[in-house]
Amino acid sequence: KGARENSGEVFGFSLVYSGNFVAGTEVNEFHISRAFIGMNPFDFNWRLNPGETFTAPEAVMVYSGKGFGGMSRTYHRLYRTRLARGTFRDKNRPVLANNWEATTFQFNEDKIIAIAQKAKEAGVELMVLDDGWFGNRNDDTTSLGDWFPNQEKLPNGIGGLAEKIEGLGLKFGLWFEPEMISPESKLYEMHPDWCIHAEGRERNLGRQQLILDLTRQDVRDFIIGFLTDILKNNPISYIKWDYNRNFTDIGSAMLPPERQSEVAHRYILGLYEILETITTAFPNVLFEGCASGGGRFDPGQMYYFDQYWTSDNSDAIARLKIQYGTSLVMPAIMQGAHVSAYPHHSLHRFVPMKTRGHVAMTGQFGYEFDLSKATDETIAEMKEQIALSKKIESVVHFGDMYRLDSPFETDCSSVEFLSEDKNTAVLFHCCTLGKINGAPHFVKMSGLDRASEYACEETGEVFSGAVLEDVGLAFRHSKDFESWIYIFHKQK
């Protein structure tokens, strides 16, 4: 009660689980508060035979006496250093370009190469081929499960394209949606019982697709098999693992009626088995999960995925709230954030390139528009953005995050990233709504060494830590969608 971003007592509860859950608080007749989080009991039963064990998901409880910010920083450090694992845990990630918002399903090898050439010119390090490369996948109604290259689009196959991308000096990444199946696919023709479904009922589609039944060993073997084959036989450095719908009609043809309430949890156990197998077999592949459109971004996924596409809404101004809210528990190093098109392809908002870049730099930085059409001016600006991203990424990804201005409460957003030794601070500020003759907005920093002096790299000005925290920096909000990034270095 009464807790704020930087003050008050906060109790945080987070579940290391990717399945159905329930969380809540209640007060009993003696005015005692109770908080709970765990597996959702709705439609869940589990037969536990003599001698068997059942392991419930872990709940991670955090106490903070320094408000929501203190809670978040505890979660960030804990999950980044103790839950995340693997080759990339303590490394900065490559700057990537993804073709999805540039082409959707309509592309060929020449188009992808054209995007990659401009990406390389700008300094991008990884080219990702998204949805549409397999089967007869020309829209979202078909071919999930048919994981072989579309010869019309890619006459030289995945391997041929990947070699050309690598020949440009880029790494190559590939999109999959391994957990899904299209009713219009060769896989469904052969195995119509392989999807999650309730016997005797119509199978309801989400995004024109069904979910594979991961409770089945044959389905898990199939997924592990095709992923292993493609990763072994092609120079792939990155996998984007999508998940575009959630559950309906939960049931499995493999379980008897009295055990159908085990399906949802068994699915998650099956998913974890697949992810454990694949990520262990290919430790040098960077794996990125996707929160949209199935709405799955949780600590259970963080154990397997190096980073996560935070939302399919890539509009920079919308992302201020999305990334702010996600940061309550998830660290910046986990949040995929890309520079999208001008205007944005779905919101049609005109956000300057500078601001789109700044917003993306507060997460895992990349690009998501048609680079093949980029002008020399755009390429030059991209080079500057990538250079700035490289300069600040270690502080953003491995430092402490302080939320200073909430986009939910003000017409701006401010976030500070502070290195562990407090020697370097990165301040991001964005105005979402300009004002005529408005008073300056002061952004007060946090976590600094108050007795030391900090020099601003961009302006050359020197401030004490106490002044930066108690008075702050003044910003004029003279126009919409303007942003700033300032870097501060503690003086010896």
PLM regions with names:
Residues S182, L187-D221, H265-S372:
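Glycan-recognition surfaces
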Residues G51, A97, M127, I165, ...:
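Conserved, mostly hydrophobic/aromatic
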Residues K1-S72, H76, L83-A84:
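Catalytic and substrate-binding clefts that recognize carbohydrates or anionic sugar/phosphate headgroups
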Residues E125-W133, I223-P256:
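Active-site groove signature of glycoside hydrolases
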Residues E5, S406-D449, I487:
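Carbohydrate-binding surface patches
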Residues S464-K492:
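C-terminal beta-strand-rich structural cap/linker in extracellular carbohydrate-active enzymes
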Residues F88-G225, Y238:
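Aromatic-lined carbohydrate-binding/catalytic grooves of carbohydrate-active enzymes
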Residues K354-D405:
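Catalytic cores of secreted or luminal carbohydrate-active enzymes
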